[in-house]
Amino acid sequence: MQSIFSKWLLGREIPRRMAQVRPLSELRMSSGCKKWLRTAGISLLTAVALGTSGCLKHTRILERPQPAAVVMSASPQQLIQSVDRRYDAIHSMNATVQIRASVGGASKGKVTDYTSLRGYILLRQPAMLRVLGLLPVVETRAFDMASDGKNFKLLIPPKSEAVVGSGGVSTPSPNPLMNLRPNIFFDSLVIRKIGQQDLVYVTMNTRVERDPHTKKMVQEPDYDLGILRREGNSQELMPVRVVHISRTDLLPYQQDEYDAHGNVVTKTFYSLYQTFDQIAYPTHIVIDRPADGYKIDLTFQKLTLNRPLSNDQFELKIPAGTKIKHIP
Protein backbone atom coordinates (compact mmCIF):
# COMPACT_ATOMS: atom_id res chain seq x y z
CA MET A 1 0.00 0.00 0.00
CA GLN A 2 1.32 3.34 -0.97
CA SER A 3 1.65 5.84 1.81
CA ILE A 4 -0.20 9.12 1.76
CA PHE A 5 3.20 10.82 1.41
CA SER A 6 4.06 8.84 -1.75
CA LYS A 7 0.62 9.59 -3.18
CA TRP A 8 1.26 13.26 -2.47
CA LEU A 9 4.54 13.04 -4.33
CA LEU A 10 2.80 11.45 -7.30
CA GLY A 11 0.25 14.23 -7.32
CA ARG A 12 -2.69 11.95 -6.63
CA GLU A 13 -3.67 13.73 -3.42
CA ILE A 14 -3.12 17.25 -4.82
CA PRO A 15 -6.27 19.12 -5.75
CA ARG A 16 -6.80 19.26 -9.49
CA ARG A 17 -6.42 23.01 -9.78
CA MET A 18 -3.15 22.91 -7.78
CA ALA A 19 -1.66 19.96 -9.66
CA GLN A 20 -1.91 21.70 -13.02
CA VAL A 21 1.15 23.81 -13.78
CA ARG A 22 0.57 26.25 -16.58
CA PRO A 23 3.36 27.74 -18.67
CA LEU A 24 4.26 31.39 -18.06
CA SER A 25 3.09 32.29 -21.56
CA GLU A 26 -0.48 31.13 -20.76
CA LEU A 27 -0.79 33.19 -17.59
CA ARG A 28 -2.85 36.31 -17.84
CA MET A 29 -0.54 39.18 -16.80
CA SER A 30 -0.40 42.79 -17.66
CA SER A 31 2.26 43.91 -20.13
CA GLY A 32 4.00 45.87 -17.34
CA CYS A 33 4.26 42.77 -15.14
CA LYS A 34 5.68 40.70 -18.00
CA LYS A 35 8.24 43.45 -18.78
CA TRP A 36 9.30 43.57 -15.11
CA LEU A 37 9.82 39.79 -15.00
CA ARG A 38 11.90 39.86 -18.20
CA THR A 39 14.02 42.75 -16.86
CA ALA A 40 14.53 41.07 -13.48
CA GLY A 41 15.59 37.85 -15.14
CA ILE A 42 18.08 39.62 -17.40
CA SER A 43 19.47 41.60 -14.47
CA LEU A 44 19.91 38.46 -12.38
CA LEU A 45 21.67 36.64 -15.20
CA THR A 46 23.88 39.67 -15.86
CA ALA A 47 24.86 39.93 -12.18
CA VAL A 48 25.72 36.23 -12.05
CA ALA A 49 27.77 36.49 -15.24
CA LEU A 50 29.67 39.58 -14.11
CA GLY A 51 30.30 38.13 -10.68
CA THR A 52 31.73 34.88 -12.01
CA SER A 53 33.86 36.69 -14.60
CA GLY A 54 35.35 39.08 -12.02
CA CYS A 55 33.96 42.24 -13.61
CA LEU A 56 32.52 43.45 -10.27
CA LYS A 57 35.95 43.57 -8.63
CA HIS A 58 38.07 46.68 -8.26
CA THR A 59 41.64 46.39 -7.01
CA ARG A 60 43.41 49.46 -5.65
CA ILE A 61 47.17 49.66 -5.46
CA LEU A 62 48.30 50.80 -2.01
CA GLU A 63 51.64 52.34 -1.18
CA ARG A 64 53.84 49.74 0.43
CA PRO A 65 56.01 51.09 3.27
CA GLN A 66 59.71 50.64 2.74
CA PRO A 67 61.85 49.16 5.50
CA ALA A 68 64.11 51.58 7.34
CA ALA A 69 67.57 51.85 5.81
CA VAL A 70 69.22 51.76 9.23
CA VAL A 71 68.03 49.78 12.26
CA MET A 72 69.98 50.13 15.50
CA SER A 73 69.84 47.92 18.57
CA ALA A 74 70.28 48.66 22.26
CA SER A 75 69.80 46.79 25.51
CA PRO A 76 67.37 48.06 28.17
CA GLN A 77 70.31 49.32 30.24
CA GLN A 78 71.72 51.20 27.25
CA LEU A 79 68.35 52.85 26.62
CA ILE A 80 68.14 53.96 30.26
CA GLN A 81 71.67 55.36 30.11
CA SER A 82 70.85 57.21 26.89
CA VAL A 83 67.82 58.94 28.45
CA ASP A 84 69.84 59.84 31.55
CA ARG A 85 72.76 61.21 29.51
CA ARG A 86 70.49 63.42 27.44
CA TYR A 87 68.92 64.86 30.59
CA ASP A 88 72.29 65.47 32.27
CA ALA A 89 73.70 67.09 29.12
CA ILE A 90 71.24 70.01 29.20
CA HIS A 91 71.86 72.43 32.06
CA SER A 92 70.16 75.46 30.55
CA MET A 93 68.23 76.51 27.46
CA ASN A 94 67.57 79.83 25.74
CA ALA A 95 65.24 79.46 22.77
CA THR A 96 63.33 81.58 20.29
CA VAL A 97 60.21 79.72 19.23
CA GLN A 98 57.02 79.98 17.24
CA ILE A 99 54.07 79.03 19.44
CA ARG A 100 50.78 77.72 18.08
CA ALA A 101 47.94 76.70 20.36
CA SER A 102 44.66 74.91 19.68
CA VAL A 103 41.80 73.92 21.95
CA GLY A 104 39.02 71.36 21.50
CA GLY A 105 39.12 67.99 19.82
CA ALA A 106 36.92 65.05 18.86
CA SER A 107 35.19 65.00 22.26
CA LYS A 108 34.30 68.68 21.90
CA GLY A 109 33.19 68.34 18.31
CA LYS A 110 35.38 71.24 17.16
CA VAL A 111 38.93 72.60 17.25
CA THR A 112 39.85 76.27 17.62
CA ASP A 113 43.30 77.30 16.37
CA TYR A 114 44.87 80.42 17.82
CA THR A 115 47.10 82.83 15.92
CA SER A 116 50.74 81.83 15.97
CA LEU A 117 52.92 83.83 18.38
CA ARG A 118 56.62 84.45 18.53
CA GLY A 119 58.00 83.59 21.93
CA TYR A 120 60.96 82.83 24.14
CA ILE A 121 61.77 79.96 26.47
CA LEU A 122 64.32 80.05 29.28
CA LEU A 123 65.09 76.86 31.20
CA ARG A 124 67.62 76.12 33.90
CA GLN A 125 68.08 72.90 35.81
CA PRO A 126 66.70 71.66 38.09
CA ALA A 127 63.32 73.41 37.72
CA MET A 128 63.59 77.08 36.67
CA LEU A 129 61.42 77.99 33.69
CA ARG A 130 60.12 81.06 31.91
CA VAL A 131 57.90 81.12 28.82
CA LEU A 132 57.01 84.41 27.12
CA GLY A 133 54.63 84.90 24.19
CA LEU A 134 54.35 88.09 22.11
CA LEU A 135 51.29 89.45 20.34
CA PRO A 136 51.54 89.57 16.52
CA VAL A 137 52.59 92.84 14.86
CA VAL A 138 52.79 94.95 18.04
CA GLU A 139 54.95 92.30 19.79
CA THR A 140 53.86 93.24 23.29
CA ARG A 141 53.42 90.46 25.84
CA ALA A 142 50.47 88.15 25.24
CA PHE A 143 51.41 86.05 28.28
CA ASP A 144 54.37 85.59 30.58
CA MET A 145 54.89 82.55 32.81
CA ALA A 146 57.69 81.94 35.32
CA SER A 147 58.37 79.16 37.82
CA ASP A 148 61.02 78.10 40.31
CA GLY A 149 59.69 74.55 40.42
CA LYS A 150 57.55 75.10 43.52
CA ASN A 151 55.49 78.18 42.70
CA PHE A 152 54.60 79.89 39.48
CA LYS A 153 53.21 83.15 38.11
CA LEU A 154 51.19 83.56 34.94
CA LEU A 155 50.66 87.12 33.71
CA ILE A 156 48.18 88.00 30.94
CA PRO A 157 48.78 91.73 30.17
CA PRO A 158 45.97 92.17 27.57
CA LYS A 159 43.45 91.28 30.31
CA SER A 160 45.39 92.77 33.23
CA GLU A 161 45.07 89.40 34.95
CA ALA A 162 47.53 87.12 36.71
CA VAL A 163 47.48 83.67 38.30
CA VAL A 164 49.76 82.86 41.23
CA GLY A 165 50.09 79.52 42.97
CA SER A 166 51.67 76.08 43.02
CA GLY A 167 52.20 73.90 40.00
CA GLY A 168 48.98 71.91 40.35
CA VAL A 169 45.50 72.47 38.94
CA SER A 170 43.00 72.37 41.81
CA THR A 171 39.93 73.64 39.95
CA PRO A 172 40.20 73.42 36.16
CA SER A 173 39.40 76.62 34.27
CA PRO A 174 36.77 76.63 31.48
CA ASN A 175 39.54 78.08 29.33
CA PRO A 176 41.82 75.08 28.71
CA LEU A 177 44.92 77.22 28.18
CA MET A 178 44.54 78.64 31.70
CA ASN A 179 45.24 75.12 32.98
CA LEU A 180 48.72 75.15 31.45
CA ARG A 181 51.37 74.76 34.14
CA PRO A 182 55.19 75.12 34.06
CA ASN A 183 55.85 71.47 34.92
CA ILE A 184 54.01 70.42 31.75
CA PHE A 185 56.38 72.55 29.69
CA PHE A 186 59.49 71.49 31.62
CA ASP A 187 58.83 67.74 31.44
CA SER A 188 58.12 68.02 27.72
CA LEU A 189 61.18 70.12 26.89
CA VAL A 190 63.58 67.86 28.81
CA ILE A 191 62.76 64.17 29.25
CA ARG A 192 63.55 63.41 32.87
CA LYS A 193 66.01 60.81 34.08
CA ILE A 194 64.91 57.36 35.17
CA GLY A 195 65.24 56.95 38.94
CA GLN A 196 67.11 54.14 40.66
CA GLN A 197 63.87 52.92 42.26
CA ASP A 198 61.84 53.04 39.06
CA LEU A 199 60.63 49.77 37.57
CA VAL A 200 61.37 49.57 33.86
CA TYR A 201 60.32 47.41 30.93
CA VAL A 202 61.14 47.52 27.22
CA THR A 203 58.98 46.36 24.32
CA MET A 204 59.48 46.60 20.56
CA ASN A 205 56.99 47.98 18.08
CA THR A 206 56.79 49.38 14.56
CA ARG A 207 55.39 52.65 13.25
CA VAL A 208 54.83 53.84 9.69
CA GLU A 209 55.94 57.40 8.93
CA ARG A 210 56.36 59.46 5.77
CA ASP A 211 59.97 60.46 5.18
CA PRO A 212 60.10 64.29 5.03
CA HIS A 213 62.83 64.17 2.37
CA THR A 214 61.79 61.33 0.03
CA LYS A 215 58.04 61.69 0.78
CA LYS A 216 57.80 57.89 0.86
CA MET A 217 56.25 55.74 3.59
CA VAL A 218 58.88 54.14 5.81
CA GLN A 219 58.37 51.34 8.33
CA GLU A 220 60.41 52.23 11.40
CA PRO A 221 60.93 49.84 14.32
CA ASP A 222 61.13 51.35 17.79
CA TYR A 223 61.69 50.64 21.46
CA ASP A 224 59.03 51.52 24.05
CA LEU A 225 60.75 52.23 27.36
CA GLY A 226 58.11 52.05 30.11
CA ILE A 227 58.53 53.37 33.65
CA LEU A 228 56.28 51.92 36.37
CA ARG A 229 55.67 52.54 40.06
CA ARG A 230 54.48 50.08 42.68
CA GLU A 231 51.36 50.88 44.70
CA GLY A 232 52.65 50.70 48.28
CA ASN A 233 53.58 47.14 49.21
CA SER A 234 51.07 45.61 46.83
CA GLN A 235 51.68 43.75 43.59
CA GLU A 236 49.88 46.47 41.65
CA LEU A 237 52.03 48.39 39.17
CA MET A 238 50.93 51.71 37.68
CA PRO A 239 52.37 53.37 34.57
CA VAL A 240 54.27 56.63 35.06
CA ARG A 241 55.43 57.30 31.52
CA VAL A 242 56.53 55.62 28.31
CA VAL A 243 59.39 56.94 26.19
CA HIS A 244 59.16 55.85 22.55
CA ILE A 245 62.61 55.63 20.96
CA SER A 246 63.23 55.23 17.23
CA ARG A 247 65.62 52.45 16.26
CA THR A 248 66.83 54.44 13.26
CA ASP A 249 68.78 56.85 15.50
CA LEU A 250 67.97 55.82 19.11
CA LEU A 251 66.39 59.24 19.77
CA PRO A 252 62.99 59.76 21.49
CA TYR A 253 60.12 60.66 19.18
CA GLN A 254 57.29 60.52 21.77
CA GLN A 255 56.69 60.50 25.51
CA ASP A 256 53.41 59.51 27.19
CA GLU A 257 52.83 60.61 30.79
CA TYR A 258 50.17 59.14 33.09
CA ASP A 259 48.32 60.34 36.18
CA ALA A 260 47.89 58.43 39.45
CA HIS A 261 44.91 56.54 37.99
CA GLY A 262 46.72 55.30 34.88
CA ASN A 263 45.20 57.82 32.47
CA VAL A 264 47.32 59.47 29.79
CA VAL A 265 47.56 63.18 30.67
CA THR A 266 50.33 64.38 28.35
CA LYS A 267 51.57 63.12 25.00
CA THR A 268 54.64 64.91 23.67
CA PHE A 269 55.94 64.42 20.13
CA TYR A 270 59.52 65.17 19.04
CA SER A 271 60.80 65.57 15.48
CA LEU A 272 63.29 67.36 13.22
CA TYR A 273 66.35 66.83 15.38
CA GLN A 274 69.35 69.11 14.91
CA THR A 275 72.68 69.29 16.69
CA PHE A 276 73.29 72.19 19.09
CA ASP A 277 76.60 72.31 20.95
CA GLN A 278 77.10 68.61 20.12
CA ILE A 279 73.66 67.74 21.56
CA ALA A 280 70.87 66.38 19.35
CA TYR A 281 67.66 68.24 20.16
CA PRO A 282 64.24 68.32 18.41
CA THR A 283 63.32 71.58 16.68
CA HIS A 284 59.63 70.66 16.61
CA ILE A 285 57.77 69.68 19.78
CA VAL A 286 54.01 69.15 20.14
CA ILE A 287 52.51 68.98 23.64
CA ASP A 288 49.09 67.30 23.62
CA ARG A 289 46.86 67.36 26.70
CA PRO A 290 43.90 65.19 25.59
CA ALA A 291 41.91 65.41 28.84
CA ASP A 292 42.35 69.19 29.11
CA GLY A 293 41.55 69.63 25.43
CA TYR A 294 44.50 71.65 24.18
CA LYS A 295 47.70 71.34 22.16
CA ILE A 296 50.83 73.48 22.16
CA ASP A 297 52.97 73.38 19.02
CA LEU A 298 56.54 74.68 19.38
CA THR A 299 58.84 75.31 16.42
CA PHE A 300 62.37 76.25 17.48
CA GLN A 301 63.91 79.04 15.40
CA LYS A 302 66.99 79.58 17.55
CA LEU A 303 68.39 77.50 20.40
CA THR A 304 71.35 78.01 22.71
CA LEU A 305 72.21 75.35 25.26
CA ASN A 306 74.24 75.46 28.46
CA ARG A 307 74.90 79.20 28.64
CA PRO A 308 74.67 80.94 32.05
CA LEU A 309 71.21 82.29 32.98
CA SER A 310 70.80 84.57 35.99
CA ASN A 311 68.03 84.45 38.58
CA ASP A 312 66.78 87.85 37.37
CA GLN A 313 65.89 86.34 34.01
CA PHE A 314 63.34 84.10 35.75
CA GLU A 315 61.86 86.89 37.88
CA LEU A 316 58.36 87.93 36.79
CA LYS A 317 57.05 91.18 38.26
CA ILE A 318 53.30 91.71 38.27
CA PRO A 319 52.33 95.34 37.51
CA ALA A 320 50.29 97.30 40.04
CA GLY A 321 46.55 97.22 39.40
CA THR A 322 46.61 93.71 37.93
CA LYS A 323 43.79 91.43 39.06
CA ILE A 324 45.50 88.48 40.77
CA LYS A 325 43.93 85.06 41.23
CA HIS A 326 45.57 82.91 43.91
CA ILE A 327 45.26 79.15 43.58
CA PRO A 328 46.53 76.38 45.89
Language model region names:
Residues 110-117, 141-147, 262-267:
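Amphipathic hydrophobic-ligand
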Residues 2-55:
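Sec-dependent bacterial lipoprotein signal peptides
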Residues 55-116, 320, 326-328:
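N-terminal leader/targeting segments and the immediate start of mature chains
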Residues 56, 201-321, 325-328:
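Gly/Pro-enriched, hydrophobic low-complexity segments
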Residues 82-83, 118-123, 145-147, 268-275:
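Extended lipid/amphipathic-ligand handling interfaces
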Residues 74-77, 156-239, 318:
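Flexible, processing/modification-adjacent segments and terminal tails
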Residues 100-104, 136-138, 150, 157-159, ...:
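Hydrophobic lipid-interacting interfaces of membrane-associated proteins
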Residues 57-58, 126-187, 322:
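An acidic-aromatic
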